[in-house]
Amino acid sequence: MKIGIDGRAVKWYRGTGIGTYTHQLISSLNNVDKDNDYLIFLPDGSSLKNLNDNFRVEPVKANLQENFWDEVSVPNILDDHSMELYHVPQNGVGLSENINCLKAITLHDIIPLRMPETVSDRYLKIFNDE
């Protein structure tokens, strides 16, 4: 299977739960899976060490505020590489509707739904819209 993973959290959220989870997910898959092919999206200039031959890094030029990358670039790259599954580990934030392959997210918590007063209005809107 050809699997794309949004690995931007490894760089952008390093030291947080989502950043640590994303890094450990990629590292663990690298250690145990020699059969599937992986395309890991990372911010331009970032890298992951000691990846096996079935892992490729796709550098992306985007920042936290841009959604052009999510809406246009990701779907095109996934199509160009015939990806069968795309995983977004950060609560599905940034998951474009324009993606043609199967999609998966990791939902870390539902605090914005259960206790909306504990999160910013901006995050609450993003969470509810996604």
List each model region and its residues.
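Carbohydrate transferase catalytic cores enriched for Leloir-type hexosyltransferases
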Residues: 1-130
